Regions:
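Long, intrinsically disordered, low-complexity segments
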Residues: 22-27, 41-44, 97-100, 128-129, ...
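Membrane-proximal, proline-rich intrinsically disordered regions
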Residues: 23-81, 251, 526-536
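Short, surface-exposed recognition loops and adjoining beta-strand edges that mediate ligand/DNA contacts
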Residues: 36-38, 64-91, 176-179, 210-226, ...
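Conserved, well-structured interaction surfaces
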Residues: 44-52, 56-62, 96-170, 186-193, ...
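Glycine-rich, aromatic-lined ligand/substrate-binding cores of catalytic
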Residues: 60, 64, 291-380, 438
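Flexible, polar/acidic helix-loop-strand segments at domain edges
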Residues: 97-116, 123, 343-420
């Protein structure tokens, strides 16, 4: 797979050489050094290089280095990286992760006290729209040229992911496509309008994409249809009308393309933790092994060095310390970079209490290494278990699932899963319990996930909504779905408390309008006809 990575990143370098940064004036944001490539005499390879910018817009912050030449202004390059921004909103605001440093705006996310002026909310909103603009530029460039139809489908899928994130986190948002001329003022669309467009767009993309595996690191039919399934799963929240039957059908379509390989023939990778290690590229689309990762972001220790992505998920969870009965060493996980600033809440840790043998938390650093479960001191890294899920280790023994230290690097080679087949199985199980799919099949599907984790299978009596929510937490933690799940189950703003929720040590409810984030005040100021979300 390393040869595939080399090719991916050589294409990305070509994109940078072409100056493919995007003209984003049609979104009235703040790009740095914007350029638009025009059609004409570009070769197919150069078109592919421009498409690479649509991909890199989700992987890195900008053109150069981990914190240099970011595509957006106002935040440092590390904080403003695409998936790190989503993590700050969808994970920091929940029970799964607490950031202990007093970074501007982050404490408000961790304690559910944010406002419309929060810089990180603005940065994440802006990052989504800069990415949308980059994809729009590419689609304008290729037009209706049939030679580049597959590339256009990929760009549309990438853009759909960003619009999905807007619908999920902000509800309403500005809307611009390649059909609008550059410089066109965005029109604000409601959550329902954006949902309807997304559904139509994704249905068309899925229908036209090939069933074949895409090239390594690219998005194909599985990824696009999984995003559609995720849209349908949350339809009742997004529109007021459930679409669990449509979600279940998408799940069945995806599963049918994967059965017969992997764990118990389910298409799942045999060893859970191998999905998040330094040579997990084999499980990516086009990776050559069991492709459980339906959509992911390719990373390489030499060529992609963001302070977001998997670097963030590794380094923030590690701290090298050996004193007073406390031990942890970042090099044990194949990395020589450690921040020690992100840990679990006790409520999150308790999700594993019923089956402590669960492999999904087997690498966490707990009491035996001097870490406490309780978040007694908010700013103390060891007051809370260290959550080790993402590593730069290498696969070793398939029978035991063991891993080994390879080359120790500052940045990981670990690719970042965006949507996995395990999520699809859990989506189907939830749809079944909500009356829109086969219950026996839903039970079988959730048990694939549980048995792979080394915990006892559920019986029919165990198949409850609460158990599905908890299983999603155990399986998908730190994969940017927790806030969305809690909102869908009615347990985000109220109905379930965790340490420091609403800024209270024991946790407290907060207003339900905060199920959505505010439209940033900077956006409202620059687009006075845009409406703010209720409550802000």
């Amino acid at each position: 797979m390393k040869s595939y990575k080399t090719k991916i990143f050589s294409v990305l370098c070509a994109a940078m050489a072409l100056g493919a940064t995007s003209c984003v004036g049609d979104l009235d944001l703040m790009p740095n050094d914007p350029n638009t490539i025009t059609a004409g005499n570009l070769t197919p390879e150069q078109y592919e290089a421009v498409l690479a910018k649509c991909y890199s817009g989700m992987a890195v912050s900008g053109q150069y280095g981990p914190d240099g030449a970011s595509d957006i202004s106002g935040l440092d390059g590390g904080t403003s990286q695409y998936t790190r921004g989503i993590f700050m909103l969808n994970e920091f605001s929940t029970d799964e992760s607490k950031w202990i440093w007093a970074d501007e705006g982050v404490f408000d996310l961790v304690t559910n006290t944010w406002s419309k002026g929060n810089a990180n909310i603005f940065g994440t909103y802006s990052r989504m729209y800069v990415h949308i603009a980059i994809c729009n530029d590419f689609l304008r460039l290729v037009g209706n040229d049939e030679k580049f139809a597959e590339m256009a489908l990929e760009a549309r899928a990438l853009r759909a992911m960003s619009y999905y994130n807007i619908v999920d986190m902000f509800g309403k948002g500005g809307f611009v496509t390649e059909a609008d001329a550059p410089g066109t003022a965005p029109v604000q669309k409601s959550r329902v309008e954006l949902y309807n467009w997304l559904e139509t767009e994704l249905l068309d993309i899925v229908a036209k994409m090939s069933d074949a595996q895409p090239k390594y690191g690219r998005v194909g039919k599985d990824g696009a249809e999984a995003l559609l399934a995720r849209l349908y799963l949350n339809a009742e929240v997004f529109t007021g009308t459930p679409a669990y039957d449509k979600c279940a059908q998408c799940c069945e379509n995806i599963i049918s393309r994967h059965v017969g390989t992997g764990f118990q023939g389910s298409g799942l990778v045999e060893n859970y933790l191998w999905l998040f290690c330094g040579d997990n590229d084999v499980y990516m689309p086009g990776g050559g092994d069991t492709n459980e990762i339906l959509w992911g972001i390719a990373y390489d220790a030499t060529n992609t060095q963001p302070y977001g992505g998997t670097t963030f998920l590794c380094a923030a969870a590690y701290k090298s310390v050996d004193e007073g009965g406390v031990y942890m060493n970042c090099e044990d996980y194949g990395l020589n970079q450690q921040w020690g600033c992100m840990h679990a809440t006790p409520e999150f840790s308790d999700k594993f209490a019923a089956a402590p043998e669960d492999v999904r938390w087997s690498m966490w650093v707990k009491e035996d290494k001097g870490f406490k479960k309780e978040n007694t001191k908010f700013s103390e890294f060891t007051d809370g278990y260290a959550v080790v899920k993402f590593t730069n280790l290498l696969r070793d023994n398939k029978a035991t699932g063991s891993m080994k230290v390879g080359e120790i690097t500052k940045f990981p080679n670990t690719d970042l899963p965006l949507i996995r087949l395990a999520d699809v199985y859990l989506m189907y199980a939830e749809c079944a319990l909500r009356g829109a799919a086969n219950t026996a099949k839903g039970l079988q599907y959730i048990n694939y996930v549980r048995e792979r984790a080394g915990v006892p299978a559920y019986t029919a009596i165990d198949l409850t909504l609460d158990n599905i929510l908890d299983e999603r937490c155990r399986e998908l933690y730190w994969e940017n779905v927790r806030r969305t799940d809690l909102v869908r189950f009615g347990k985000f703003a109220k109905g379930y408390n965790w340490s420091w929720k609403a800024g209270v040590p024991e946790g407290a409810d907060f207003p339900e309008y905060m199920n959505l984030f505010p439209i940033p005040s900077n956006v409202i100021a620059s687009q006075p006809d845009f409406e703010q979300n209720i409550g802000y």
